[in-house]
Amino acid sequence: MIYISWNATQDVRLGGSMTVVPITSSDLTAAEVSWFSALCSDDYQFLGIPDGNLRSSWEHCSSIVKEAENYGFRNILCPSSYQVGQDTLSFVAGCAPITEKINMLAAVRCGEMQPIMLARTIATLDHMMNGRLTINIISSDFPGEKAESGYRYQRSREVVEILKQAWTQDEIDYEGEIYKFSGLTTEPSKPFQVAGPLLYFGGYSPPALELCGQHCDVYLMWPEPKEQIIGRMKSVNEVAEKYERTLDYGLRVHMIVRDTEAEAKEYAEYIVSKLEDDFGKKIRERAQDSSSLGVSHQAKNRKIADEFGY
């Protein structure tokens, strides 16, 4: 799995010279190409067939991080899910002294930790990483919980706004629907990076776009037809423009690289050759974000895909 953040040109372009939306990092000369550490026991030789040698462990997952750094990847996603595997923030802390260049994209499910203590925890990690920390804001359900989408995004909004107060102000004064704080000093939660780590965010619903456009830095998407990706970029950019902001954009993709397309398709068939449809559905449904709008769009895309699944 690879994450690519588009920030290489004056404007993001898809298909020839067509300009889509302005971006924040227009002065950079390369896109951020990132990797993925399989913290949630999802590293398989054959999809859906557990392999003891690839089971999520500190040794296996940290070796992925070190190898990604050796190959020059700029960032690496450390996902979060209630499955057999590694706790995200603990794992990132462990990687601080064994890496030097690669950034860590830590997935944080908003509400799991009290927001002010979360601000301090992230600030501590940011210092341990010497500023090589980025945060993927997650709004999915907690284990054993089913909450309405509107509530989950409101919770994420309030957590993000509290984090920003903690990282940019002298005191936290916050009056939200879920959280209320007054007169708390922010001295314990000052990060290494000015204003805190960059916030990456993915979501397709109107509350998700509003939250990302107002407060986050990178909007993450999944593979879809080009016209749909363009539409999503324009939608979140419209929100950002209301707040006189711009964003960068990222695409989460699974890539199989071979010398020819025929060889790539052959390997794609190989790695799914032992996966049963019912078990694949079970894997998807056990994730905390299985009922999200974005996941439902991916399911729709699978239904209209060709025999190779794309």
List PLM regions with ranges.
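Acidic-and-aromatic substrate-binding clefts and catalytic sites of carbohydrate-active enzymes
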Residues: 79-87, 111-116, 225-230, 257-259
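Acidic (Asp/Glu)-rich catalytic clusters
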Residues: 69-70, 92-100, 122-132, 213-214, ...
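Conserved, mostly hydrophobic/aromatic
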Residues: 72, 95, 125, 163, ...
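Aromatic/hydrophobic pocket-lining residues that form the small-molecule binding cavity
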Residues: 57, 61, 88, 118, ...
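An alpha-helical appendage that flanks or caps ligand/catalytic pockets
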Residues: 4-42, 149-192, 224-310
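Hydrophobic faces of well-ordered beta-strands that scaffold small-molecule active sites
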Residues: 31-37, 76-78, 104-107, 133-137, ...
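N-terminal beta1-alpha1-beta2 module of alpha/beta enzyme domains
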Residues: 2-99, 175, 192-197
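Well-ordered beta-strand positions
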Residues: 165, 217-218
